[in-house]
Design a protein with these regions (language model features):
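Membrane-proximal intracellular helices of multi-pass ion channels
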Residues: 1-496
Length: 496
């Protein structure tokens, strides 16, 4: 590449070295469980070697490119860095699964992608897995829920951090400095995990199960230590606790901060807070009505199962309290698909289109009709309430919003068609499964799993990756690489 194109790439490699060391450290965290379960000391062999290699690789890379630390990233190179960070994390975290000899590359990458993207679909038999590996899966969801870039910059450096954080799919920031923002987010995050763990223990969970379920509920990840998920416990208090944690994880972290600082009105007026709670309330009511006859006229049972699973779907958590989704009324089944597509809050741990975009879409439709029937053709300024302050919305904002929704739905249909074609599943089931993949949810009708075709697994891994990064980051990164490569080739040809 020519000098102009090359500028910033050495800094990317320097950051990758730093991040490689961080991934190596993450691989060591699950070994804490060996202290509590000494008989699982043999699990060390699956984590220590790859952790050492990743840390060593990162250290060498950091030394080689240390002199470039004062360089600046060029425009859109932050997107390239974020994409490469995620790819490094996914493949690095897949190594322990491969070393067990029980998983091939497709399965290991699928599990790692599901962890970091906080999806919760799995190829692991949790009834046979060691506690070290079960905790490892939860650690992946904890880190992925907070955001890989956030964890990196909050613990190490803020240089270019905010640009990367926004590129990772987070639309808001708590404070101008990402280190402070990151530490506040992690404090809120950890606070909910601690509260959730304590409540689960009080209501009868073993401490290990309580810790894992609390982590994965707040991360809206959905990995469980039980094959039956939350349904294993058949406990209403545990289900209510899970709903509370799912809501917490699905809410924008900035909204949490507004509530904590006493700014309740600002939190409630926020556009996606209204959208999220109004849509959820309506959907839960409709879900309950649609399930009453299915549960033989029991309103309480219909409310319990209808509310839990819709909230699990819309927050992108994926926990369930029934053995299977097959046989459910088709209307409710479709409602769950809609919930998975919509998603919850921007700046939360969930996936999907996100409630900010849903709210803006609904508002823009209203504005369009209102402008058309207005008596006088006047140009009106449109506003939305965003995190306690009014924000002007122009045509570009509306166009960009609809563009994202359209791209999301196109990818959803492509993925569903691939699932249906390869697995021979009905289009309804394929749409459900890929909506779960793309929305990083984790609810499943059985298309994904240990015995799934490699095409299904790789399509899922790509879908989870794109769903977590929200498409545009990936497109921008690929475009930037293509443009720089083209410019470099042209430069070389001119020299020749």
């Amino acid at each position: 590449m020519d000098r102009r194109s090359l500028r910033g790439y050495p800094l990317i490699f320097s950051y990758l070295g730093l991040f490689s060391m961080l991934i190596g450290i993450i691989l060591l965290i699950p070994l804490i469980m060996v202290v509590f379960y000494p008989h699982e000391i043999n699990q060390v062999q699956y984590f220590l070697p790859p952790a050492f290699v990743l840390i060593l690789f990162g250290f060498i890379s950091k030394i080689l490119y240390a002199k470039y630390d004062k360089e600046r990233l060029e425009r859109h190179q932050d997107a390239i860095l974020v994409v490469l960070l995620w790819i490094l994390a996914i493949f690095g975290a897949a190594i322990p699964f491969i070393l067990t000899g029980e998983f091939n590359l497709s399965q290991a990458v699928f599990e790692s992608s599901s962890g970091f993207s906080t999806t919760g679909l799995t190829v692991v038999d949790v009834t046979r897995a060691s506690r070290v590996f079960l905790f490892y899966r939860s650690v992946l969801q904890f880190v992925g829920g907070a955001g890989l870039v956030l964890v990196l910059t909050a613990t190490i450096s803020d240089k270019f951090g905010m640009r990367m954080y926004n590129a990772e799919g987070h639309g808001d920031k708590l404070m101008p400095n990402l280190i402070r923002s990151g530490r506040y987010i992690l404090a809120i995050y950890l606070g909910y995990v601690i509260v959730g763990t304590i409540l689960y223990i009080i209501f009868g969970m073993h401490w290990f199960d309580a810790l894992n379920h609390a982590i994965c509920a707040v991360a809206t990840g959905g990995f469980s230590t039980k094959a039956q998920s939350i349904g294993y416990y058949q406990s209403l208090p545990i289900e209510i606790t899970t709903i509370f944690l799912m809501f917490a994880g699905g809410t924008n972290f900035f909204v949490h901060l507004l509530v904590i600082t006493g700014k309740w009105k600002s939190a409630l007026k926020h556009i996606e807070t209204k959208s999220f709670y109004i849509i959820t309330a309506l959907a839960v009511s409709i879900s309950t009505l649609s399930l009453i006859s299915y549960y033989h006229g029991s309103f309480g049972t219909a409310l319990r199962y209808g509310a839990f699973h819709f909230i699990s779907a819309v927050t992108g958590t994926g926990y369930q309290i029934i053995p299977s989704f097959t046989g459910l009324p088709s209307f409710y089944f479709g409602l769950l698909i809609v919930g998975m597509i919509l998603g919850a809050g921007v700046g939360s741990t969930c996936g999907g289109i996100k409630q900010y975009r849903v709210g803006l879409g609904i508002k823009s439709i209203y504005w369009s009709f209102a402008d058309k029937i207005a008596h006088h053709k006047v140009i009106k300024k449109h506003f939305i309430n965003k995190l306690g302050s009014k924000m002007i919305v122009d045509d570009d904002d509306i166009s960009e919003n609809y563009s994202f929704i359209l791209v999301y739905l196109i990818f959803l249909m492509i993925g569903a068609l691939i699932f249906s074609l390869v697995s021979q599943a009905s289009m309804q089931n394929a749409l459900f499964e890929f909506a779960s993949v793309l929305g990083t949810v984790g609810l499943s009708v059985g298309i994904t799993g240990y015995d799934a075709h490699p095409i299904i697994l790789w399509t899922s891994s790509v879908g989870m990756f794109l769903g977590r990064l929200e498409f545009y980051v990936f497109f921008v990164a690929i475009s930037k690489l293509f443009i720089d490569s083209k410019r470099s080739i042209k430069h070389l040809l001119q020299k020749a």
